[in-house]
């Protein structure tokens, strides 16, 4: 398949620049992967769509204020976007400046040069930067960092983004983009879902800035995914086994939860074992033809044209059904991307 197969026309005004006042106030488009049937509704419908015995799997990563502004010792301005923390004093980052800094370049980060750092090495498009202060990276980011809103939101970050570009159940700092399907859940909805007899479980995938990188090859089979760190702990493995045994469904909240679970499943397949805990980097790229091992339903936002995420959804619901659903969403003026509306998708189990 070609990247252009996943193109759709999106009017600029449908890109959500701000979240709705209430987390659960977004709209929800249901898609049945077998029939292709679409149902328009609101996010609170999730409470009716999940059933007792189901398992909801969330990504509990926490977005770090990963964008910093500063200058080189020579005076040139730069912007640093953390891709991942290598240790307590070293980061791997994207750097925007008039000229890429060479190894040994001294940097001053923060509006008032609060922190001194040295560019140590370049790894393809990324720069390894070490801070000289005793302060650990997370504390530095909390002092001078900005929330790394995606490029298409196209505005400076504001104080409210610190709360709203973050799930209510976040626990483990390390993401530079929010797992956006989770932004629709508030504490009250989570409690109502549990009261219904639905189990909740948490994986971790630290979303990298690479999630916004366009696919730069025409044939999707030639695309190579960026690596992201994943944790699928023992309690999730146990919860999945118990859910499947009782005939419940595994409902993944967000494409990052899908990629975490399916990474663990692929690891087990390759090793010829049953599902086991998985801790490590994943480069899993899911596109049509992929056989899902664990996930039965998916809650996800609307994704960018030609992105790896619309490919993942197409593999889940079927290509034709997915593209028809997106066409419907544009016609009905759903709000797109991180701060936009969501879908509830039942997996295609019979080929259309």
Curated annotation (Swiss-Prot):
Keywords, sorted A to Z: Cytoplasm, Queuosine biosynthesis, S-adenosyl-L-methionine, Transferase
User: Where is this chain's protein located in or outside the cell?
Assistant: Cytoplasm
| InterPro entries hit by this protein | QueA (IPR003699), QueA_dom1 (IPR042118), QueA_dom2 (IPR042119), QueA_sf (IPR036100)
SUPFAM superfamilies with a match to the protein in the record: QueA-like
Q: Does the keyword S-adenosyl-L-methionine apply?
A: yes
Record keyword Electron transport present: no
User: From the Swiss-Prot or TrEMBL record, what is one GO molecular function term?
Assistant: S-adenosylmethionine:tRNA ribosyltransferase-isomerase activity
Q: What class of enzyme is it?
A: transferase
* Lineage top rank: taxon: Bacteria
EC code: 2.4.99.17
Catalysed reactions, as listed in the record: 7-aminomethyl-7-carbaguanosine(34) in tRNA + S-adenosyl-L-methionine = epoxyqueuosine(34) in tRNA + adenine + L-methionine + 2 H(+)
Q: List GO BP terms, alphabetically.
A: queuosine biosynthetic process; tRNA wobble guanine modification
Q: What is its main location?
A: cytoplasm
Q: Which Pfam families match?
A: Queuosine_synth
Pathway of this protein?
A: tRNA modification; tRNA-queuosine biosynthesis
Q: Looking at the UniProt record for this protein, which Gene Ontology cellular component terms does it annotate, in alphabetical order?
A: cytoplasm
Question: NCBIfam families given for it?
Answer: PRK00147.1, queA
Q: Give the UniProt family note.
A: Belongs to the QueA family.
Give the function comment from the record: Transfers and isomerizes the ribose moiety from AdoMet to the 7-aminomethyl group of 7-deazaguanine (preQ1-tRNA) to give epoxyqueuosine (oQ-tRNA).
Subunit composition and interactions: Monomer.
Q: What is this protein called?
A: S-adenosylmethionine:tRNA ribosyltransferase-isomerase
- This protein's species is Vibrio cholerae serotype O1 (strain ATCC 39541 / Classical Ogawa 395 / O395)
């Amino acid at each position: 398949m070609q990247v252009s197969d996943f193109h759709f026309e999106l009017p600029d005004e449908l890109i959500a620049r701000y979240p709705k006042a209430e987390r659960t106030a977004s709209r929800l488009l249901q898609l049945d992967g077998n029939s292709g049937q679409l149902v328009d509704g609101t996010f609170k419908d999730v409470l009716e769509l999940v059933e007792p015995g189901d398992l909801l799997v969330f990504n509990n990563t926490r977005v770090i204020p990963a964008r910093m502004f500063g200058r080189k010792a020579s005076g040139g301005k730069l912007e640093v976007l953390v891709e991942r923390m290598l240790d307590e004093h070293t980061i791997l980052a994207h750097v925007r400046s008039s000229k890429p800094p060479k190894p040994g370049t001294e940097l001053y980060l923060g509006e008032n040069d609060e922190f001194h750092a040295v560019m140590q090495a370049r790894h393809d498009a990324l720069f390894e930067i070490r801070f000289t202060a005793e302060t650990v990276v997370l504390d530095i980011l909390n002092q001078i960092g900005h929330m790394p809103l995606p490029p298409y939101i196209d505005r400076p970050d504001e104080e409210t983004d610190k709360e709203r570009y973050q799930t209510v159940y976040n626990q483990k700092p390390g993401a530079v983009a929010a797992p956006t399907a989770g932004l629709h859940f508030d504490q009250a909805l989570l409690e109502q879902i549990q009261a219904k007899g639905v189990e909740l479980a948490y994986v971790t995938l630290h979303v990298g800035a690479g999630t916004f990188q366009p696919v730069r090859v025409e044939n999707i089979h030639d695309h190579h995914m960026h690596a992201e760190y994943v944790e699928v702990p023992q309690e999730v493995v146990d919860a999945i086994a118990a859910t499947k045994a009782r005939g419940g469904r595994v409902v993944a909240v967000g494409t990052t939860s899908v990629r975490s679970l399916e990474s663990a499943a692929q690891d087990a397949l390759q090793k010829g074992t049953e599902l086991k805990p998985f801790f490590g980097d994943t480069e899993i790229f899911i596109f049509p033809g992929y056989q899902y091992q664990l996930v039965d339903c998916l809650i996800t936002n609307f994704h960018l044209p030609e992105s790896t995420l619309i490919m993942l959804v197409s593999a889940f619901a079927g290509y034709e059904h997915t593209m028809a659903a997106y066409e419907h969403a544009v016609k009905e003026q759903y709000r797109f991307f991180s701060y936009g509306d969501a879908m509830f998708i039942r997996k295609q189990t019979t080929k259309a």
